A protein has these predicted regions:
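Beta/alpha (TIM)-barrel catalytic core signal, keyed to glycine-rich beta->alpha loops juxtaposed to Asp/Glu
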Residues: 46-175
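N-terminal small/glycine-rich loop or linker at the start of catalytic domains
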Residues: 1-9, 33-38, 144-145
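Active-site groove signature of glycoside hydrolases
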Residues: 26-47
C-alpha cells in the first residue's frame, strides 16, 4: 500500500495525471519503460482527447509500449479508441469460476434468470471483434480456489474448490 499522500483518491484520466502517474510508476519500479499501461476503471469525466495526447507522449518518449483498460464497457472502449492512434490491446475484467456473469450475459439472452447479471453487455464480443485481449483479474476468486479461508462459502463453492485442486494435482501445478 502506498503512503496516504501518494494513494490515488479518484479516477483521473487527465493528461497531466496520466503522465505524472507513469513517471511515479517508473521511479517506484526502477525501470525505464512499461510494456503496457492500463487505465483502471472508467473515469466518467474523461476527455478522450487528453488521454490520446498522454498516450502519444508516453509512446513517443518510450515510457510505455502498449495501452489497455480495465473494467470498461464496449462503449467506453469505442470512445477512447476513436481518439487514440495506438490500439487498446487489453481489457482487464473480473473473471473466475465464482464470477460467471461474463458467461451468463452471453447465454441468458431474453431470459428472466439473467435480470440480475452485472456485466457489460457485449463486452466479450466487442473485444473479440477488435482483437482486444481479455485479461482476468481475481481468476481464483480472491484466493477461494487456492486455499484462502473465505466467509459465506456455499457448498457449490467448496465442490468447485475441490475440483480445481484435483485438476491442479493432475496437471502437476499449484492453485
Amino acid at each position: 500500500r502506498f503512503p496516504e499522500g501518494d494513494a490515488p483518491h479518484r479516477f483521473d484520466f487527465s493528461k497531466n495525471h496520466i503522465l505524472s502517474s507513469v513517471d511515479g510508476i517508473l521511479k517506484r519500479l526502477n525501470t525505464e519503460y512499461l510494456d503496457i499501461l492500463l487505465l483502471h476503471r472508467p473515469d466518467p469525466l474523461v476527455e478522450p482527447e487528453e488521454v490520446a495526447e498522454a498516450f502519444e507522449a508516453l509512446k513517443a518518449s518510450g515510457k510505455v509500449k502498449n495501452f489497455g483498460v480495465s473494467n470498461m464497457s464496449a462503449a467506453q472502449i469505442k470512445l477512447l479508441s476513436a481518439y487514440c492512434s495506438d490500439p487498446l490491446i487489453v481489457n482487464q475484467l473480473e473473471l473466475s469460476l465464482k464470477r460467471i456473469d461474463w458467461l451468463e450475459q452471453g447465454v441468458l439472452v431474453n431470459q428472466k434468470a439473467g435480470t440480475d447479471i452485472n456485466f457489460a453487455d457485449g463486452i466479450i464480443e466487442h473485444c473479440r471483434l477488435e482483437d482486444i485481449q481479455i485479461q482476468a483479474w481475481a481468476p481464483l476468486a480472491y484466493g477461494m480456489y487456492s486455499g484462502r479461508e473465505m466467509e459465506n462459502v456455499t457448498e457449490a463453492d467448496l465442490q468447485t474448490k475441490d475440483l480445481v485442486q484435483k485438476m491442479a494435482n493432475e496437471k502437476g501445478t499449484s492453485t
